[in-house]
C-alpha cells in the first residue's frame, strides 16, 4: 500500500478524523457505534469520515452480522504507523483525546446490541 505524507497529514488535519484515528490506534478495533458514542457526533457524520479514511486505505472495515468494525490498516507503511503511534503517545493526556478515552471506557455494553441497534 502506498500513502504519501501529504495525504496522511491532510487526513489527520481534520479534528474528527484525527480523534477517530487516535481511538483506533489505542483500541485496535472499534464498532461504528462505539466511535459515534465516544465522539458524540451523528452517525452519518461519523460514517462519512470513516468512509473517507477507508477509501484512502488508512482504515480497514469488517462486518460481523449487522455491525461494522474499523481498524487501522495493517498495510500502512511503517513510517505512517509510527506517526500515528507517536501522535497518540504525545497526546493521550491532552484534550479532547483524554476525554474520548474516558467516554469510550465508560460506555455501557460495548459493543453490544444496545449501542449498535
Identify the residue ranges that each predicted region occupies:
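Amphipathic alpha-helical dimerization/coiled-coil segments
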Residues: 78-117
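Beta-hairpin "wing" of winged helix-turn-helix
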Residues: 55-64, 71-72
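A cross-family signal for key residues in well-ordered alpha-helices
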Residues: 10, 22, 54, 60, ...
